Structure formats: C-alpha cells, structure tokens
Amino acid sequence: MSEEPKEKPAKPAHRKRKGKKSDANASYLRAARAGHLEKALDYIKNGVDVNICNQNGLNALHLASKEGHVEVVSELLQREANVDAATKKGNTALHIASLAGQAEVVKVLVTNGANVNAQSQNGFTPLYMAAQENHLEVVRFLLDNGASQSLATEDGFTPLAVALQQGHDQVVSLLLENDTKGKVRLPALHIAARKDDTKAAALLLQNDTNADVESKSGFTPLHIAAHYGNINVATLLLNRAAAVDFTARNDITPLHVASKRGNANMVKLLLDRGAKIDAKTRDGLTPLHCGARSGHEQVVEMLLDRSAPILSKTKNGLSPLHMATQGDHLNCVQLLLQHNVPVDDVTNDYLTALHVAAHCGHYKVAKVLLDKKASPNAKALNGFTPLHIACKKNRIRVMELLLKHGASIQAVTESGLTPIHVAAFMGHVNIVSQLMHHGASPNTTNVRGETALHMAARSGQAEVVRYLVQDGAQVEAKAKDDQTPLHISARLGKADIVQQLLQQGASPNAATTSGYTPLHLAAREGHEDVAAFLLDHGASLSITTKKGFTPLHVAAKYGKLEVASLLLQKSASPDAAGKSGLTPLHVAAHYDNQKVALLLLDQGASPHAAAKNGYTPLHIAAKKNQMDIATSLLEYGADANAVTRQGIASVHLAAQEGHVDMVSLLLSRNANVNLSNKSGLTPLHLAAQEDRVNVAEVLVNQGAHVDAQTKMGYTPLHVGCHYGNIKIVNFLLQHSAKVNAKTKNGYTALHQAAQQGHTHIINVLLQNNASPNELTVNGNTALAIARRLGYISVVDTLKVVTEEIMTTTTITEKHKMNVPETMNEVLDMSDDEVRKASAPEKLSDGEYISDGEEGDKCTWFKIPKVQEVLVKSEDAITGDTDKYLGPQDLKELGDDSLPAEGYVGFSLGARSASLRSFSSDRSYTLNRSSYARDSMMIEELLVPSKEQHLTFTREFDSDSLRHYSWAADTLDNVNLVSSPVHSGFLVSFMVDARGGSMRGSRHHGMRIIIPPRKCTAPTRITCRLVKRHKLANPPPMVEGEGLASRLVEMGPAGAQFLGPVIVEIPHFGSMRGKERELIVLRSENGETWKEHQFDSKNEDLAELLNGMDEELDSPEELGTKRICRIITKDFPQYFAVVSRIKQESNQIGPEGGILSSTTVPLVQASFPEGALTKRIRVGLQAQPVPEETVKKILGNKATFSPIVTVEPRRRKFHKPITMTIPVPPPSGEGVSNGYKGDATPNLRLLCSITGGTSPAQWEDITGTTPLTFIKDCVSFTTNVSARFWLADCHQVLETVGLASQLYRELICVPYMAKFVVFAKTNDPVESSLRCFCMTDDRVDKTLEQQENFEEVARSKDIEVLEGKPIYVDCYGNLAPLTKGGQQLVFNFYSFKENRLPFSIKIRDTSQEPCGRLSFLKEPKTTKGLPQTAVCNLNITLPAHKKAEKADRRQSFASLALRKRYSYLTEPSMSPQSPCERTDIRMAIVADHLGLSWTELARELNFSVDEINQIRVENPNSLISQSFMLLKKWVTRDGKNATTDALTSVLTKINRIDIVTLLEGPIFDYGNISGTRSFADENNVFHDPVDGHPSFQVELETPMGLYCTPPNPFQQDDHFSDISSIESPFRTPSRLSDGLVPSQGNIEHPTGGPPVVTAEDTSLEDSKMDDSVTVTDPADPLDVDESQLKDLCQSECAQCWASVPGIPNDGRQAEPLRPQTRKVGMSSEQQEKGKSGPDEEVTEDKVKSLFEDIQLEEVEAEEMTEDQGQAMLNRVQRAELAMSSLAGWQNETPSGSLESPAQARRLTGGLLDRLDDSSDQARDSITSYLTGEPGKIEANGNHTAEVIPEAKAKPYFPESQNDIGKQSIKENLKPKTHGCGRTEEPVSPLTAYQKSLEETSKLVIEDAPKPCVPVGMKKMTRTTADGKARLNLQEEEGSTRSEPKQGEGYKVKTKKEIRNVEKKTH
C-alpha cells in the first residue's frame, strides 16, 4: 500500500521536473537504507529534504536505523533529521531500531534525544519491541536510560508480559530485576514473588529449577513472598521444592518474616508445609518472638495454638513476653499470660517484663503485669528495680502504679542508689517531689555516702537542688572523703548551684579528708566565678591541704592565672609556705607556669623564698631548664649563688642535668663557678658524673678548677673514671687534669676505673701517663683491685704495665668499694588531692588519681664512709616524700612505678656510686628496705639522660655501660645483688670441709649455705633454675597450686651431707597475707615427686651457723623478701617451690580430734572417735571467696561461703565427720537471709569429690545432706573427704553453673610480678612501646636493647593472676594506635616472657610526650564505670634520635623481610603463590623471634651443636639465624612441620605474640589451615642455588616466587611489583543471542500480549537486495575465558586421573599442570602489557587460550569426552591461527591431531614448542626468574650447560603447587640495558641431548604424579620494553642473539627444540 507523504518536500533551489524530484527522493531513501552515506549526502546537498518520507511515513532515518547503519544515522541526525519523526503506524526510528535489535543505533538515537518512552498507535514502546524480540542488550540499554516498563499497550500488556509470552527468560529476568518499585535490586524470581506474579515465576522456574535463589543478603523468593503475604507465589514456590525453612543471613526463615509482618495466612501455609515453629535466628528469635514484638495478635495466637515454645529466649535472654511488652502490645501480652508464660521471667541481666514496661513507660501493660502478680521489687543484675527505671526515665504514671502495688521506695542498687538518687541525678523534679511525698528520705546515702543532693550537684541539676534544699535535705551532708555537695559543684564550676548552697548555709570552708576546701577545687579547675562567690561568702584564703597548699598554691600548680589574680586581689599571701616550705612561686616554677610566676613576682612574692631544704624557685627553674622563669627570677633579684642545706646552688643542678644555656645564664649573673656543696662537689664534678662535656666546656671557660677536690679527695677526673664517662675523661685530660691525683684513700683515677672494670678508661689514662704502680692507703695497685674483683680484661691490660709485688691474701678478704660523693637531696612538689571519690567521671580527661597518703615517712640510712642516701620505704611517687615531681602533664603522679624519671628527685643522681658498692661489700650491705632506692639512682641506671646532646658521639653509651659497672637485671625495688666473683656463683662453686656460703649472681636472693664440717670431701655444688616443661614429669599440680619459682636443679644429685645445709630460693608467689603457703616438693630423678619434710627451729639454725659470717633472716623477713628456705641433709635432683591455699594439718588417729582453719576461723572439721582406724595426717583448707570477685563475675545472682577441702581426698571415714562452714553473706536482694532453721530453698551445699590433679566437678548435694544452722554457720556430716561449698542462689537450677564459673576464677594462682615498659621513639609523633609483665625475667631485655628501646618505667611488685588477661589503657598525651573498639591485652604466665608490643602516637606534639599506662584486670567498659587498675605507670617517651650510622646498620635480611611483608600495610600486594606465602610466613615468624630462636630451637629438639652451627653460618643477623632454624625444621620434619606444631611450641616458650600473628589476618590469605605442613605448600627450603654465597642473599629475593621478569625500566623495589591481583584480560562478551534458540514463532495464546510486526521498508521502484546481515562467527580463538578455565580445569582433572603409568611406547606426554599464577608475569606488568606498539593485533586471538588456569584449592570436575574433543579442537585452531600469523612457522601438519587420546600429548607438545622460541624464551628456569629475557644467569663458575638441570629442578612430585619452587633463591634485581656482548658457546648437540634426557627421565619418574611441562613454566611474555607479549616463535636448532637486558654484558644463547612428539623411551 502506498500513500502520498503528508508534507510536500521543500522545493530545490533550481526548479526541476516533478518526476525527477520523486526519483531523487526515492534514490535518497534507498541510499540511506543501503548505507551509502556519500550518495545520501549528495542527494541532501542537491536539495532533497533530510526528513522526506515514503507513502508509509518511513524516512531515511527510519530506514538506516532498521538496517543498522550507524554512520548514516549519526550524519542524518547532525543534519537535523527529526529524531522522533513517526511513521503512519506511529513508530519512531527508536521503535524500528529496537525491534531490529540494532543496539548501536539505539544508543546513537537515545544519545541524540530520542524519546525512550514514545508509544506507537497501539501503545507499543521501544522497550516492548526489544523485549518481544529478545534483544537483551537493547532492553538493558533502554532500561538504563529511563525506559518505563509500566507503560502498557492499549490492551494493557507490558514489556514483561510479551517477554513472558515469548518465553524470553533472560529478558524477563532483566525486566524484573529492574522493576523500579523496589528499593533494592533483587533477582528476577524475587521480584516475581514480590509482585505475586505466578506466571513470571513459573517461566523463571521452568528455565532454572532452583527455587531457592538467594539475594545479596541471602533471602529467597519464599522470604519475599512471606514478607508481602503473597500466598499464590508462595504456594507455587513450595510446590516447586522451595525450602520452607531456608535460612537467610542471620538465620532468618520465611516463617520469621511472615510472623514479623503479621501475614497470618502465610504463617498458616508455611506451618502446614512443615515449617519449624521453633526455628531460631542468630540472635535466638523464634517466630513467636517476631510476632509478639510486632504485636500481631492473630499470628501469636496461631503460633501458641500450634505449641510454639513459650519459654524460648533470645541470645540476651528476652522472652516473647519481653518483646510484646516492649512494643506495648497489650493483647499479645494478655494472650501470652493466658498461655501461662511466667510473668517474672528474666533476661540475662535479670530484667523482667515489668522492668521493660517501666523503661518504655507502657502503663497499661505494666498494670496487666502487676495484676498478674509480677514482682514490683524484682532486681536487675545491677540492682535496679522497675521503680528505679521509671524514676530514671521520668515515667510518672508507671512510678505511681508501682508504688500503689507495693514497690519499695528505699530499694537500693548495687552501688546503693535509691530511686530518689536516680531521679535527682536525672533532674526529674516532679519524680523527686512525688517520691518525697510518698515518704522517700532525701538524706539516704549510697555506698559512697552521697545523698540525692550530692547526685543533683554532680549532674548540675539546679532545679532539683533548689527543691531538695527547700524540703529539708542536709546541705552539709558529707560523702566519702568528707565531700559536701558544695565541693562537687565548686569543682564542676556550677556557679548557680554554688550560690544556692551558700545561701542555704553551706560552709565555704568545709574540708575533705585531704584538706581540700571548695575554694581549692575551684582554683584547681580555674572557675573564677565560683571562686568569687566563695570568697564573697567568707571562704578562707589561708586554709591549707594536708600537704600545706593554699588555694593560691593550687592555682599556681595548674596555671590558673585568672583565679590566682583574684586570690591575690583578695589579699592572699603570695609567700604562703606549704608543708615543706614551698611557696606558690616554687610551685609555678616547677610546673613552668610562667604567667602565674610573673604575676606572683609582680604581687610581691619573694624570689628568695627557700623551702625547708633550702631550694629556691631558681633552683627548680635551673633543674627543669625553664629559661623564661629563671630569667624573670634573676631580674627580680633572685640570688644565683643561693644554696640549699646541703650547699647546692642552682648551677650545680643545671650542670648535672646538662642544661648548657641555663649554666651560661647563671654564670652571666655572677654564679660562682667553683662553688662546692657540703661534701665538696663543684658543678664540674656533677658534669663529670653525668658525662656533660658541653656543660664542662662552659664551666672550664668560666674558670672552673679542673682538679677541684671533694672532702674525700675526689677530683672531676676520678668521678668521670668511676662512672666510665669516656668523653668527659678525655675532655679533662685535654684540659690538663692531674692524672695521678689521689683521694683520701689513696685512690688515683686509675684505681677508680679498675675498681669499676672500665677497660676503655684505663687505656686512655695509661696513654695520658697514669702511673699503674700507685698504691692506695691499703697498699693496693689498680691491678690488685681489678684482680680481686675479677675483671679479666682490666687485669690483662694492667698486668703488662704494673710492677707486681707478690702478697698472699685469703679468699675471704673483701674489697671495700670506694665511691665518690654524690648529691641526694629531693623535694616533693606533689599535692595529694584524693580525687577517686570526687571525680570518677573525670578519669578520661587525663587527670590522674593520686593513690592516697602512702609513704609519708622517709628514712635516712647511714652508710659508713661513703655517702648519705635518701631511701624510702614505700612507693616514692605516691606520697609525701621529699621527692621532686615528674613531667608537668602528669599532675597527679600516683603511679606504681619504681622511681625511674630523671629529674623526679633532686638527688643529683644518687647513682649509688655503682650499686656494686652496696651489694658486694658485706660491711656496707644495707637491710632490704634500704634498697627501695631513691628514684634518681634507678633512673640513672636505666635511662640515658633525656637531654643528652647527640653531637658528641658516645663511644660507650648507657647501654654498654651497664655491662661494666652493674648488673642491670637486678634493678628493681629489691636487694641489688651484683657480687664480686668471689662471693657469688653463676651455676656452680666448689666447697670443702671449711664450708662456705654463696649467693647467686643471676638470681637475687638465691643463696646456698654449707656449714663447716658438713661436706665430706671437696665437692662442686651446682644449682640452676630450669623450666617446668623441660622435665618429662613436672611436679603434679592440684587446682589452685602453682610453681612459685622455677624448678631448682641441684647437683651433685644424691649428695649426702653430715648435717643440715641451707638452700634459699627467691619465689614470686603472692601469699595474700596468711591465705596461702609454700610447700617444697622434691624429686630424686625428675619422675616422681614427694613433699620435702625437714623441720628445724631457728635456734638450731643459729647454732648450725656458729662461726660463719652469715646472718639468717627471720621467717617474717623471708616472707617479706619472698624467699623460700629449704633445709636438707641431701640433695635430690630437683626441688620445686609450690604455692597453695594454706592447709592446717595434724596427725589424727582413732581417738578423733578437731581441725580448725586459721584463715577462716569459723571453718572446722570434727572427727569423732572411731572415724579413723589408724593415725594419719589430715588436712583442712579454707579458701576465702572475696565478695568483690563474686560481684564482678556473677553480679548479685548468688553469694558464696569459703571453699572448704578435707585432705587426703576421696577417703571414706568409718563414722561421719562434722563440717562447719560460715553461711554465705546476705545476697544482693537486700534482705537478710535469716537462716534460723527455716526452709531456705536458696541455700545450696555443693560438693566435689574429685581428687589429685583432676579438675573439680561440682554437684548439688543439698537434697541428700541435712543442714543444721548454728549462729552464722551451717554444719553437716559427711563420710567422705571432699571439697565443700555453700551457695546462696536465687535461681536454684543455675547454682552449679554459677559456682563452676566462679571457681575457675578462684583457682587462678596469684603471683607477684612487675610491669616494665620499654619505649623507642620512631618519629616526632609515633613511638613503639613494649610492655612486659615479668616474674624472674632479666629486665634488660636483650632484644629491646638491640633494637634501641629504652626502659621508661618499672613498677613495684604487683599481684597478678596466672593465665588471666591484663588489659592496657593509655591516658594523657599518648594514644595507642589500635583499631576502633579494640583494647590492648596480653596474658600473664609465670616465668614466661609476657610481652605486649604496640605503637602509640603523641596527641599534642607541643606538649611533653608523657602519659599514663593503666594495667587493668577487666576490659574497659563502655559504661564508663570507674575501674581499679592493678598498676599505673607514668611514662615519658625518650627523645626522638635520628639514627646514627651504627643504628642504621640493619642487616639486609631484616630490610628484605620488612619489605617482603609490606603487603600488611598494602593489602593489594598480598602474595599469591603458595611458595610465596610459606616464605613470607616463615619470614614474619623469623622477624619476630629475635633472641627467642635458641629457645625455639631447643623446643624443636635441635642439639647444641646444630644451634651453634646456625650461629656460625649466620653470624650477623638474628633474623637470618631464625630463618635458617625454621628452614632446617621444615627440611627435617617435612609433613609434620605444620602451623599447629609451630603454634604449640611458640606457646611453650610464651611467644603468644607470634601465635597471635600466626592466627591473625596476616596469615588469612590462601586460608592456610593449621594442619597443612609448610613442606606441603612447597619445598621452599632446598639448598641454595649455585651462586648464592649465603643465606642472606636468599633473603634478599623474596619476589622470586612470583616467577616474574620485572619491567626493565622500573627502578622500584620488586617488593611492590604486585599491585593488583586481577587479570588484565577481560572475558569476551558472550553471544547469548546465538546460544538461545529463537522462540519468535511461538503461537500467541488468545488474550496474550500482541506481537509487533516490523514496518514494511520496501521502497517503490527500488531494486535493493533484502539480504540479512549475518554476524561473523566468533573467532575460533576468541574463547570465553571462563569456559576455557572450566575446560582446562576439567582437563587437568582428567589428566591427573588418567595417568596410572607410562605406556611402553612412550607416547604419553607430561600431563598438564594447573598453574596458580600468570606464568612469568606479574599483574602489574600484565596491566602494562595490555597494549603497546610492539603488540600485534593478532595476539589477542591467542591470549585467551593461554590464560592461566586458576585452580584455587577446589576439586576439578571430571572432563567428558565431548569437552575433551572441544578442547582439542580449540588447540588445533590455535595452532592453525598461530601458524597463520606473520613470522610463525608451524611444525605440525594440519592433519596430525587425530584422536582424543592424543590431546594431552599434543597440548604439552604445543606448549613446549611455544616456549622454545628463540626470540626471548630460555631453557634456563633461572633466567626467566631473574627477569632477563634471553639472558642465562651465570651462577658461580657454571656455564650454560647447567641449564637442563635447572629445568629439572621444579618437578617436585610431593605437592601439587610447586611452580617456581626455588624462586626464593633467585635474584630479582632490576637490570639495566648493557651494550657489551659475551659469547658463551654451547654445543647444540650436547644441549639437545641433555634436555631430551632430562625431560624423558622426568616423564618416566614423575608421570603418575602431577607436574608441569617445562614449556608451560618457562613461557615468558615480556618484550624488551617491558610490554606484555607472548613469545611463541620457533626455529628448529637456530641460534640467535639480540639485545637483552643485563648488567653490562649480553648473552648469546642457543635454543634447542625439544619436540615431545620425537621423544622415545
């Protein structure tokens, strides 16, 4: 049919005839239809209208669109063709293109503004047409560009309907998934389920039988149907086998969903189809919970009728009743209660439904519950009743209801809060008013003594305060520490509350227990307005705290300028003196508050004011190097020469601290440079003592006497020599110091250096003419002193130069140490402001709580002839010591450290003159308490001075000094033992009839005394401490027992003595007063153990030691010093000191008797006459159960009596014995137990009859044992000895469980340990910390010292529990670098190295880098509840030092290892191959082992010789040693070398940190299971390849495993080569249209959607051909990557399955191996290699064929014959395609591939030949590893003839993942282009024969096991410029050389082709 167009086309410029015009129009349309662009354009140029159309309305755009001529369409649109022009049928170009499936045209049209939702005459849209014709891409594009699928045809059919009718399942899926109504993209079947579209669902299920398709969150269509209540689809799905109980994410089933949504019909359907009514989600919700929570009555009723579990609880213990109550669903609550749900059912926190109703304020529900007799006084775990909660949440109606039903108005919580406390704190005046109306007292106190008024003041509730004080609340009520509400509000700065309280008569001068008034607190916090109010109401300016601080002192301390100014205006005394005579100016100077100091000076404060010991503010400023304050003080007339009582001037302090500028300032203000203190010390002496050369220079330049002498005659040179300070010694000698000057005792500097063992100093002195023959007053030369003290190197140096006079001396003579004087004054700046009670909520602000008034007493001990040392008996930092405080930010220095901060004491470094002087010389040995040394002394030993100027390189730094003059491992708050050789032993010593006494050198407190005449002959006594697990049979431990020290191995074992000998062993058990005791076990052979019994009284011992110069401590002293004394007449092989619960024991026989406990006096066991038939030792143990422990673990669920044990266990008595045990304390209910013989169902008697080392098994025996109550005790009878325990528990059934839980905590053995913290500042912001909890470890951790850590804190001994975690928190200016929410934690194990390494950052770099570490038993709670730390340590980080050369000298191994696992910070660089993974895992373990490697070696059963050999082979690097050990272990143990094995051994040596690493995310890649052996993954540890001279080189090549030639132009480290794991090759798009058979001619069912027919595009008079454009068939090589992968995988499986042996004819070639990585290529290079100028287009055709087969630990499928044939065909095509590429010759005749049986052989052959290209591939596996295409690596002296051997190496039959096994040995350094050329001739014949020989040999040996064809392994894809390329060229026997990468030379190689087809066997 033909029509005239509606519009006449515009006339051309030149009129033509009408006939020609219509011809032109038709020709134009024909040209457009045929795609002849030029022709069409010519017509347009000649005047044809671009929009001209034929009689059907078709224009050029329509025609070109239909035929898919994109260029024509684009050009027409550019020439303003109407994009939305419609045909007669209303079709636009977009309709036509969509119908024809012309995707590119559709894109162009839409881009040019075509209306995607245009509708034709019958309402068809482009989307409808594309959907009808199954044009998936077009449908997708239209949907993405706004096409609406809701637009229907006139008959109401949508695109989805037509796609369903036509059966186009992919289009249906696409349309459903893009249904815009849903918020989340869901799979098609889900959408069908949502729309209840059974038809769509049926079609989708027809094509995919799985009805349980999952969405992203794991929901199935049935879940969706359940959600929307779509019964029809649900029925269909269930009929099609949908799982009725399918669990989605969090274990949600469809029944949960339907119940939650209230779809009752759906619930019924699901239950009818067998849904589990009691299914639980991950949180424990059942369908009943879901229905109840949402209040769906009908559903709840249905579920209850079907017996839903009404008692079921969630993870948190919530029942359906709680849920219904929470949602205020009254009807559901009633329903549940009708079904007899317990009304008082509790959650895990003991919350009832009534608590929930009170919380939410649901009045009606609360009423129903109370009517059903819910308990109004039920207590939650924290003691809150519903009334408390109602008061907290301001629910006044519920509150009144509760009171009406008898709720207790005085009920108290755990912390003693009543409802009025809670309401006052929350600020609810109306509730407070109602409570008081109902009789609540406003003056009731909580456990801290606080009333409601305190609470209101604390939370700043002014209205409540007003109401309370008007209604009779006591304004002056005192809480704990005597705090009044006024104190609290003053501290918090609540001026309005302060005003109210003062007006109501509150005393402004009320003081807390530590003497703080409200004014002090306001001053401390800087609240000027509050201070003004207080002063207006008469607050006193002069009241002092216990420390004598006035409010002005406090303001000065905290730098509160405004308050200080106000106080001074109000006439506060600027010179008020505190307890130690400190003025506010002293305090301001100490805390560097310059503005306050200036204010005080302006207001007349005296700069001359001196503290009691004579310190002026200038002394303090000089000590702390506060230049500004010092300058101000001097300007105000401070005397630079003012001295303290000891004669110390400011310049002394500045000199000692090394403050050069301060010294210069003081000297410029006329300070006397030669001023000496009372003992004669000048500033130069102190500079010499501290090695301050820079200060010494200033002093000497200003006229200091170089040879000034102290009273004892010491010159600065003596002092420098004594302390081993080489730099100052050199300086003094350069300035003509007298080298032979003598002290009063006749000591020269040389004597002093010899006494201290400083060889380096001695050498310098001798070079400077020191006389070695000078004698002391006692006639000793330096040599004699050194010899006596056992300094071998010193003796060797001096004996050459000394003239010796022979003398005889007895061995017992002791050397009296000569020590120069030092200064020891300290000054306490602290002000004890007990803030525990007043400010718990301020803990997080970095404000620190002082630990109270400890240690107020100072003791002076006189030490003859040496010096006076200030010694403290208690913790030096917490109390009122004469100490000078720490850094300014640690305002409340109450920590548990041993004093360890440099300036924390004006002790001018009481360095104790080398502690040796006090321990080695008996006449000066102090008693124990004197060793709680002054802080400076300790600090000097531990921490090099913070201000040390680094310009002077210190040849002998403080670390090295330790080894000269003291034993740093004993630096603790205990007796310092570092005896001379003659009085101590390391392991053994000789003794004879004269007897002897020896102290242990390593372990302080160890001593062996052999009295005279007790040893029969000269004997070598040995004594060493050994680890428990070293013994095959360690001593058996009962629960609650633990070793208190290491095992003591004595020798000679079995030695008999003529009388008792004494062995004293230090122990670490905490005795908890008298609660625990020590017993000694002995073992003669290490196999059996028994208790060591030897009683002897003290008098006997004294008599025994008669004539010996030994003193024995009393038992009390032994207890204090924690020493166990063993008295024995013979030596067993081992002693064990065991800590256990104290046991009362006695011999009891048939006559009977009574045993009573001394620990818990009410506990007793009464044995009647005849209970025992013979006399035996019977024991009674009573272990107290601390209430706080019970509360911490169980809350107020239960209370317990002591645990009582009768020993020996499991013994039956002939008559019952009577046990008496005190009743448990009253329970948390707040009601007295009232045990008066009444029925007490809550009181239970528990019993455990297990004995020996078996764990206790508690059972409830209340029912079978009658209990009798006597006063506060319960007695009962028993005829077996066992463990008994009384419990008072509300939930009787839970008693045993709760008891067992508590018991596990109670049996943890307590130890006394110390916390030590090491730090290293990495950069100005970040530092590394290592925290240790040590028992008997050496404190100078060698690893930390080697890594340049400094000790920054050490605690006194603290009680810790075995095996329990210790949580670490950081406050102040330091923040730990942890993931959010994570807490630092490590476990304590006795005698193990408990190390916690972590990093911290400095919050504010402008402030001092100091903070506090708190060690806690519990994790930090989110509730912010106050927690008591077991230990607090204040730390200041060491200064950031730039590493000097020596520090930088890390071994290459270490660097390589660090780089090797840089992927830890760069996850994308995670290693891929198993060899790589194993190597890195080893590397990480090695890097962390440090010095523990030897311990590990011993645990792994390596001999001493093997360990020494590892040391010798790797002398310079700990990491190399560790790595070599692991390598040897894997080689030796093979398959048994598993991660689990390593973990267990590491746990034994207590390297839990490494175990954590092994189990942590670092090792997650590859999901390596613990049972998999390192050897299985690959034999990384074969001997080094030739050419690698040392193990170090192996460590340098971590990337070898990647088999990746690096990019030649890339200079980066190869550690970063792997930036991406993804393959750069993308999967070719699937031609899905070709795969899906067309269903276009299905008959339409009646009433189905109409099918659009295409427009008739035939043109009048046109003779165009109507042939269809046929798409070219897919390129035979363009194989879909995933298909190929599957095929390859299945082929591999087939290969592996079908290689039982080698056929005789040898035709079977190597089986194909799966590879785990892209062969020879890193991903980064692949990415780069995607394109490039060198790449030929045709390479793409072969790319996909050689994609890697990534078989990642999944089983390959069996390959069918068809698949095998398909694969074979692809390979054939690949060969043909390759031979068709230019320059590629094909050796194989095209007809050579005949049968499937040959497939594998030829594939292998093909790969082999592909690899043997002469272009860039190589035979040597080494060369392809080294990343040098074409270059053979010359290894050592070997030539290229080694290649076949190298090729053979990778075949390891043991494992399946062996690619690149030796790659760890290969060198991967980037090479640069070289220009030389080197010939390495190789005989072609030799190489060919060898290669053939090796290959065939391998095939014969290894064929039954999977291995990789050499060719496949060696394929390289790198061109000279690093671009990816496949080298597949082959030239038989040809020799070629071309430019290669190399270091200055090139290699010419011959490539011999091994053709698998030619192999013969």
From Swiss-Prot:
InterPro entries per the UniProt record, alphabetical: Ank3_Death, Ankyrin_rpt, Ankyrin_rpt-contain_sf, Ankyrin_UPA, DEATH-like_dom_sf, Death_dom, Multifunctional_ANK_Repeat, ZU5_dom
Keyword set includes Nucleotidyltransferase: no
Residues covered by region (UPA domain): 1274-1408
Tissues and organs where the protein is expressed, per its UniProt entry: Expressed in many epithelial tissues, muscles and axons. Expressed in kidney, brain, skin, lung, liver, intestine, pancreas, heart and testis (at protein level). In testis, expressed in Leydig cells, but very weakly or not at all in Sertoli cells or seminiferous tubules. Expressed in macrophages (at protein level).
MF terms in GO: cadherin binding; channel activator activity; cytoskeletal protein binding; protein-macromolecule adaptor activity; sodium channel regulator activity; spectrin binding; transmembrane transporter binding
Localization per Swiss-Prot or TrEMBL: Cytoplasm, Cytoskeleton; Cell projection, Axon; Cell membrane, Sarcolemma; Postsynaptic cell membrane
Compositional bias ranges of the Basic residues kind: 11-20
Modification Phosphoserine occurs at: 22, 606, 830, 844, 850, 873, 914, 917, 923, 958, 960, 1114, 1451, 1462, 1470, 1473, 1795, 1813, 1883
Entry-linked Pfam families: Ank, Ank_2, Ank_4, Death, UPA_2, ZU5
SUPFAM superfamilies registered for this protein in UniProt: Ankyrin repeat, DEATH domain
A Gene Ontology BP annotation from the UniProt entry: neuronal action potential
Record keyword Repeat present: yes
Biased composition (Basic and acidic residues): 1-10, 1725-1740, 1808-1818, 1933-1961
Cited SMART domains: ANK, DEATH, ZU5
ANK repeats mapped onto the chain: 56-85, 89-118, 122-151, 155-184, 186-213, 217-246, 250-279, 283-312, 316-345, 349-378, 382-411, 415-444, 448-477, 481-510, 514-543, 547-576, 580-609, 613-642, 646-675, 679-708, 712-741, 745-774, 778-807
Region (Disordered): 1-25, 1606-1678, 1698-1740, 1784-1818, 1844-1884, 1915-1961
GO cellular component terms, semicolon-separated: axon; axon initial segment; cell surface; dendrite; intercalated disc; lysosome; membrane; neuromuscular junction
Chain ranges of the ZU5 domain: 985-1140, 1142-1289
Annotated Death domain residues: 1478-1562
Sorted UniProt keywords: ANK repeat, Cell membrane, Cell projection, Cytoplasm, Cytoskeleton, Lysosome, Membrane, Phosphoprotein, Postsynaptic cell membrane, Repeat, Synapse
Description of what induces expression: Up-regulated by high dietary Mg(2+) levels.
Start-end of Polar residues biased regions: 1784-1795
Subunit structure: May be a constituent of a NFASC/NRCAM/ankyrin G complex. Interacts with RHBG. Directly interacts with DMD and betaDAG1; this interaction does not interfere with DMD-binding and is required for DMD and betaDAG1 retention at costameres. Interacts (via N-terminal ANK repeats) with SCHIP1 isoform 7 (via C-terminus); this interaction is required for the localization at axon initial segments (AISs) and nodes of Ranvier (NRs). Interacts with PLEC and FLNC. Interacts with KCNA1; this inhibits channel activity. Interacts with SCN5A. Interacts with PKP2 and GJA1/CX43.
Purpose of the protein: Membrane-cytoskeleton linker. May participate in the maintenance/targeting of ion channels and cell adhesion molecules at the nodes of Ranvier and axonal initial segments. In skeletal muscle, required for costamere localization of DMD and betaDAG1. Regulates KCNA1 channel activity in function of dietary Mg(2+) levels, and thereby contributes to the regulation of renal Mg(2+) reabsorption.
This protein's name: Ankyrin-3
Gene (UniProt): Ank3
